[in-house]
Amino acid sequence: MRKILPSKLAFGIFDHLDEDGNAMARQYADRLTLAEACDRLGFYAYHLAEHHFSPHGRSPSPNLFLSSVAQRTRQLRLGPLVMLLSLSHPLRAFEEICMLDHLSGGRAELGIGRGSLPIELGYFGIDPDAVAGRYFEASEILMEAMRGGNLSYRGDHFELNNVPLILRPHQRPHPPTWIATNRPESARWAATNGANVACVGPASLVRRITDAFRSEEGLSSDANCNASFLGLLRMIVVGHSAEHAYSLAAPAFQRWLNNFKFLYDLHAIPVPPNLPLTFDAAIESELCVVGTAAVVRRTLLDQLEEAGANYLLCQVAFGDLPLDASLYTAMTIQSELMDRVG
C-alpha cells in the first residue's frame, strides 16, 4: 500500500462500459485494447463501475472483466468503482478481491458502495429499506475479513459462525479502498478510515468534499500514513479541432445519456436532478470537457485546482465513441498533462 501522500497530480481511467452499439465481444475487446494502451501510457489505475440489467453497464461483474485487464497489463492498477456491497455477500466479495489482487500481482484497488439506483438491487429481491443496513454490515465484514483467521459476525442481515478465511489479499493489510461520494460527511468518514474518494460535479461543489476530507484528515492520528487520492471525474474528448471534438462527443454523450436513463425511463421515475439532459448542459455543468488539446489541458487544470483534487478520473470511452477517439484522448492526456504536471 502507498505510504506517502501524492505530491503531484495523478491520472486514472474511469469506465461504465456502457453499451456502444457493438456486439459485446467487440466492445470488450476494444476496452481491453484501451486498457493496454493506458498501461503503456502510465495511467495509475482503471476503475470500472458495476450496473445490472441496464445498457448503462456491460460489466455487471467488474472483477471478472478486470481479471482480463490484469492479464494484459503490467503496471496499471485496477478495481471496481464501486462494488455493490448491498448486493454482494461480503464473504464472496472478499474472496473475489483476494483473487483479483493476486491475479494482478498486488494491483487491486477496492471501491465499495451501496448502489445509486434501488431498482437494480430490487431485481435481486433487495428491499430498498434494507440497502443501507446491508451495506454497513457488509463493509464491516469485508474489512474484518482482510485480517484473516476465523470470522464470526452477528447482525440484522448477516450471521457468520467461525468462518475459516483461507484466502488473504496480496497487499497487506488490504488493497487501497475507495468510495464515491458527493457528501461532506462521507468524505470525513473516508479520511478517518484511510479511504480515497471519487467525486463528480462542478468543481466548486466538489471543493466542499475535498475540504471536508482534508479537515478531518488533519485531525486523524492513524489514517494519514496511507496516501489519499481526492478524485475528480470528467468525461473527456480531445479532437484535432474544436469542431472535430464536438462532433465526436455530442452523439456519444447522447448515447451514454440514453443508456444512463434506461431504467429510469422504463419505470417512469425521475432522473437525478443534477443529471445534464443535453450535451450543452453537460459542458456547462463541467461533466464533459471537450476541445483541442490546449483547451482541454487548461480547463482540466483549472477545474482540478478549484476542486482541490489531486487525481483526475478520465472517462475517455463512453457512448459510441470510436476506439480511435478514446485512444487519441488518452494519448493527449499523457502528453499534455501527465508528462507536464504529473
Swiss-Prot record:
GO terms for cellular component: cytosol. GO terms for molecular function: monooxygenase activity; oxidoreductase activity, acting on paired donors, with incorporation or reduction of molecular oxygen. Keywords: Monooxygenase, Oxidoreductase, Plasmid. Belongs to the bacterial luciferase oxidoreductase family. This is Uncharacterized protein y4wF. The lineage of its organism: Bacteria, Pseudomonadati, Pseudomonadota, Alphaproteobacteria, Hyphomicrobiales.
